[in-house]
From Swiss-Prot:
The gene is psf3. One of its GO terms (cellular component) is CMG complex. The lineage of its organism: Eukaryota, Fungi, Dikarya, Ascomycota, Pezizomycotina. GO terms for biological process: double-strand break repair via break-induced replication; mitotic DNA replication initiation. It comes from the Eukaryota. The keyword Transmembrane helix does not apply. Pfam families: PSF3_N, Sld5. This is DNA replication complex GINS protein psf3. The GINS complex plays an essential role in the initiation of DNA replication. Component of the GINS complex which is a heterotetramer of sld5, psf1, psf2 and psf3.
């Protein structure tokens, strides 16, 4: 993604739980207390980009300012639900850019099992998305709830699959151009 990519900017603005390891003078504005200090052990949800920047000290060999935690969208409860049946999980309510957020977070954490769960989730949901996209009546009825729960990556996939199915029907002479 590029610097000016809106989806990338929105992904980086998603909140990530961070725990301060050191006392930081004058940074209380992050808690809504301007002019106050942030005490060591304070847990605050920060935008992903800021949390990553504040955690960089550990990589440079200095004391870590903050420790990053997994966001609620990737909690054990969500991962277990994805293992059970990924098609029933409303990813959009967890994070509008769920897969982009997952990719960014998994760059920071070593969670091999979660990678496998997310790959399996995408495969199963992509098959369901393709089914709804190729079946014009599939977006109605029981499929409407599923389609409302798609994250942005899945919505783009649905649009491309739907448009290509429509173009194929037009090419085959089964449908008219609008």
């Amino acid at each position: 993604m590029s610097y000016y990519d809106v989806d990338s900017i929105l992904t980086d603005s998603q909140k990530l739980p961070c725990t301060f390891e050191l006392e930081v003078p004058g940074l209380g504005i992050l808690e809504g207390n301007p002019g106050e200090d942030i005490k060591a052990g304070t847990r605050i949800d920060l935008p992903l980009w800021l949390g990553v920047m504040l955690s960089i000290g550990a990589r440079l060999g200095t004391s870590r300012l903050v420790t990053l935690d997994l966001p609620s969208a990737l909690s054990d409860r969500v991962v277990n639900a994805l293992k059970a049946d990924p098609r029933t999980v409303d990813l959009r309510s967890l994070a509008p850019h769920f897969y982009s957020l997952s990719e960014r977070v998994l760059d920071l954490f070593e969670e091999e099992e979660m990678v496998d769960v997310l790959i399996n989730t995408f495969k199963k949901r992509a098959a369901e998305i393709a089914d709804h996209a190729h079946n014009p009546k599939g977006a109605l009825g029981e499929g409407a709830d599923f389609l409302r729960g798609l994250d942005e990556t899945e919505r783009q996939l649905f649009r491309v699959a739907h448009d290509s199915a429509r173009e194929t029907r037009i090419w085959a002479g089964e449908a008219k151009k609008r």
